[in-house]
Amino acid sequence: MFCRNLFASNISRNCSIGMDGDFNFVNNITYNWWNRSIDGGDNKSLLNIINNNFKPGPITPLDKPTSYRIVKPEAGRAKEFKDVYGKAYVNGNIVHGNKRVTADNWDGGVQPPVSEDKMEETLAKIKMDKPFDMPHVTIMDAKKAYNYVLSHVGATFPKRDAVDHRMVKSVKTGKAIYAKDAANYEFVPTTVKRRLPVDSYKKGIITDPRQVGGLPEYKGTPVLDTDGDGMPDAWEEKYGLNPNDASDAIQDINGDGYNNIEKYINGIDPTKKIDWTDLKNNHDTLEGKKKLF
């Protein structure tokens, strides 16, 4: 299950559908792809691609069908099924800048590699009118998902990481962000044949972190953790654990099924037992918080 992720500014690292089974892609954002949005699969693939956002960026070839591609189903993994595709439920996805495909995802957004005269017949065999069974998830409409993902994705706790801030800003503005001296930091091994121009950083595709200003330097004051179990002394003392006993990190103080260190990491009060098997209790436990304790 791929849910509420951001896939941004790459040429070959977006989702590739595996063979023989389900593939669920819900409420994600794919931005600034070059030759791949989603592709792959085989005759046994069962795809749910629901309420996502596909936003072309500076590197996306707007003069090609790739620019409004949601998914490219593939076949031919086995000789006896070389022309047999899997099944797909594709619905509710927004392709930014393309009203036609947004209105009907099957009007150009699903692109099996067949000739035009076989396209209608092939799509009819692939298309499903109802989604396949998949893990429980609250599905947002695509517009709401776009805003939700951009405000929640990445390293946001206790504040947004500088790298993720740059990526999110690029998605919002639709523009590549790079350093003034980016041209000085080209790095591609001589053994690698380039597929893009040397200045592809101007379109969001970098080959060296220094092309976008380098990696940020993080500073902070470590909290006291006497037993080194990953849980601060103050948190352990607050909830009746032993700051001198590292073994209590993997214990379960309230029997809810999560280790104590998992409770700490997820901001859960270990004195309150919650039935996490009840789906209505499942939520983002860090939502709205600025610190763990």
Where are the regions a protein language model picked out?
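A conserved active-site cap/scaffold subdomain adjacent to cofactor or substrate pockets
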Residues: D42, L47-P61, T66, E74, ...
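Acidic, divalent-cation-chelating loop motifs in proteins
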Residues: T221-D229, D248-D256
